Amino acid sequence: MAWNTNLRWRLPLTCLLLQVIMVILFGVFVRYDFEADAHWWSERTHKNLSDMENEFYYRYPSFQDVHVMVFVGFGFLMTFLQRYGFSAVGFNFLLAAFGIQWALLMQGWFHFLQDRYIVVGVENLINADFCVASVCVAFGAVLGKVSPIQLLIMTFFQVTLFAVNEFILLNLLKVKDAGGSMTIHTFGAYFGLTVTRILYRRNLEQSKERQNSVYQSDLFAMIGTLFLWMYWPSFNSAISYHGDSQHRAAINTYCSLAACVLTSVAISSALHKKGKLDMVHIQNATLAGGVAVGTAAEMMLMPYGALIIGFVCGIISTLGFVYLTPFLESRLHIQDTCGINNLHGIPGIIGGIVGAVTAASASLEVYGKEGLVHSFDFQGFNGDWTARTQGKFQIYGLLVTLAMALMGGIIVGLILRLPFWGQPSDENCFEDAVYWEMPEGNSTVYIPEDPTFKPSGPSVPSVPMVSPLPMASSVPLVP
């Protein structure tokens, strides 16, 4: 079967069409929040407020940190593949730029609709970044195996499903999920894993050599890890209530991440017969504590509780990279490029369970009467709302998230299997040159039907060329 990866018309038309639609929808539906509107001046005077009381000054530092995580952290974390750095950063940039626009609309229709208009302020921007973070998680599962058009389509559907799932959890079930262990990480991970299972490639071994990293690519990926690790306390506390909740969320995340690093290093060394460290574990498993503490981050988890979560997740995540990822690929045909099940999936489920237990154990002694009302809205839509009820609904939220991710992933995966999206052939996966103009001599794209094809220059010593494989002739690349 021939694969046409020439996107000269398909990609420009797709990008332009989507952006024109965004412009029209924003023109019809989107307006500034009153704190971003010019009428803020009269509002400020009427209520005797200062400019510093504008929500922008409270939320913008957190927004900056979350924004860096989405575009720099996730982007560079996926540059570990030796020949897929352009695509990892570039396609992450593309899907995030489209995703934040669509997320502002979808989340606005569910949460911020006033007099038929979506009002946009700095908190909307943070929530849109959260939504896109879930898409970046799913991108890790299909990394190297899909075209940019497929990624845009996946982003469109995933953002839509994310907004629906978020509305069900936060508005209908009254779930607390400040750091998004369920809504962001669990949903994104199992949506992405389901999509990659539907897109299973039987002959992916033909691109096996490109799935390895080299010294430089691992260093770039470590940059992404460090940005994510440093800014994760802002991520988990960005939309918490001002004051003690936000303060507590940052402290809990800080502690969990620190503990996770030590246990990840310990297990990585213990699993190697000579006690050496695996860079894959250090890049990924060290972040699992930030994922797992997300749901309970703003609760009275206590610093030692956060340390325990990080301790446990560092062990589980590292073991997952060593044993679970190969098992999923060999037995269940789930080709998880970045190991998102170990960094986001399992830690996300752990986070959901920890959040349920922590909520169910909330008491007057720990929170105080006003603290319970403030933290869990116990005087909200149901007068009989108790801590145990909150715990049960936290579990319901986790189950709903898993169901939405699996069902949505199946549907979107079937759509992405259609043959005209410009996806790469099996022997040309994990290769930048399929979609990017490369420096001379850096292309290893294999075109077996062209007997005159020769590399454009000498190979780069640090990036070994991939030799043609016997099975490649059955799946040619049509330029």
Curated annotation (Swiss-Prot):
Keywords: Ammonia transport, Cell membrane, Glycoprotein, Membrane, Transmembrane, Transmembrane helix, Transport
Cytoplasmic side: 1-9, 82-85, 145-148, 201-218, 272-281, 325-345, 416-479
Catalytic activity: NH4(+)(in) = NH4(+)(out); methylamine(out) = methylamine(in); CO2(out) = CO2(in)
Name used for this protein in its record: Ammonium transporter Rh type C
Top-level division of the source organism's lineage: Eukaryota
Gene: RHCG
Family annotation (InterPro entries): Ammonium/urea_transptr, NH4_transpt_AmtB-like_dom, RhesusRHD
Cell location: Cell membrane; Apical cell membrane
Assembly with partners or alone: Homotrimer.
Protein family according to the UniProt entry: Belongs to the ammonium transporter (TC 2.A.49) family. Rh subfamily.
Alphabetized SUPFAM superfamilies for the sequence: Ammonium transporter
Gene Ontology biological-process entries: amine transport; ammonium homeostasis; ammonium transmembrane transport; epithelial cell differentiation; homeostatic process; intracellular monoatomic ion homeostasis; regulation of pH; transepithelial ammonium transport
Glycosylation sites: 48
Functional note: Ammonium transporter involved in the maintenance of acid-base homeostasis. Transports ammonium and its related derivative methylammonium across the plasma membrane of epithelial cells likely contributing to renal transepithelial ammonia transport and ammonia metabolism. Postulated to primarily mediate an electroneutral bidirectional transport of NH3 ammonia species according to a mechanism that implies interaction of an NH4(+) ion with acidic residues of the pore entry followed by dissociation of NH4(+) into NH3 and H(+).
Disulfide bridges in this chain: none
Spans through the membrane: 10-30, 61-81, 86-106, 124-144, 149-169, 178-200, 219-239, 251-271, 282-302, 304-324, 346-366, 395-415
Effect of mutating residue 137 to I: Reduction of ammonia transport
Molecular function per GO: ammonium channel activity; ankyrin binding; carbon dioxide transmembrane transporter activity; identical protein binding
Record membrane topology: Multi-pass membrane protein
Tissue expression pattern: Expressed in brain, testis, placenta, pancreas, esophagus and prostate. Expressed in squamous epithelial tissues (at protein level). Expressed in kidney.
Pfam family membership, one: Ammonium_transp
A single Gene Ontology CC term: basolateral plasma membrane
